[in-house]
Amino acid sequence: MNDYLDKIRGKLADEVEDSLEYSHLSKEAMESGDDAYAHVLKDMAEEEYEHAKHIEYILDRAGVQHPDMHEKMAMARKNL
């Protein structure tokens, strides 16, 4: 496996976790009445989710085994 693919594989879980974290922070900000911050955090969650989708696509196309993130990605998608 190419070194860059190994590095990308290591980022998949990070991106999904970041998406979930930003989504959670967005909800907290919304509950606190900080709507502007909530929207920015939600945008950040969406960006991280898109990064995860792109990473998964690259790894799948390259035939690289990677952690099964379908459950967490579904949770992240639901939170968006």
Residue ranges and their predicted role:
Residues 1-80:
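Non-heme di-metal
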